[in-house]
């Protein structure tokens, strides 16, 4: 899931050193970067300001996550206003259902209790979660864990999408 982080770190340092727009692909000089580079250009600006590469990578993602969460909340609030009723509670429910979605795979982990070895595997086993349990052929990917955190282009695309929809 996080295999492209090295690529993004390379893009960030390359864009910071090139100081050209549109940026070029650092491995193939003279070739324009065809990958969505909004997030990496923002991170390269933060990197030029003198922050560490780690901070330059994480800080824009943090603000984009806040913008996406706020955008989903405000969009849900606007939709709930249209239908009437308790706006605030329904908007928070919409956020919970949208971002922390999943299936009923938790049954496989909780069928022997909260303190069983089955349940603790969620926290100790490599990528063994109630929504991604290969042994039972459960592959229900979570939007937050499988799309927004590891895929920077999706995160920044959604950060721009929700203000447009509102």
Language model region names:
Residues 1-160:
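Active-site lumenal/periplasmic loops and adjacent helix-entry segments of GT-C-fold
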């Amino acid at each position: 899931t996080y295999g492209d982080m090295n690529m993004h770190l390379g893009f960030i340092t390359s864009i910071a050193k090139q100081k050209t727009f549109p940026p070029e692909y650092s491995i193939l000089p003279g070739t324009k970067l065809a990958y969505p580079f909004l997030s990496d250009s923002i991170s390269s600006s933060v990197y030029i300001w003198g922050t560490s590469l780690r901070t330059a990578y994480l800080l824009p993602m943090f603000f984009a996550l806040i913008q996406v969460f706020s955008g989903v909340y405000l969009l849900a609030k606007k939709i709930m206003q249209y239908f009437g009723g308790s706006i605030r509670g329904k908007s928070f429910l919409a956020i919970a259902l949208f971002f922390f979605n999943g299936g009923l795979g938790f049954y496989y982990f909780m069928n022997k209790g909260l303190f069983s070895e089955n349940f603790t595997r969620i926290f100790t086993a490599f990528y063994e979660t109630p929504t991604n349990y290969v042994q039972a052929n459960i592959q229900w990917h979570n939007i937050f864990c499988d799309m927004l955190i590891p895929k920077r282009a999706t995160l920044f695309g959604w950060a721009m999408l929700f203000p447009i929809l509102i």
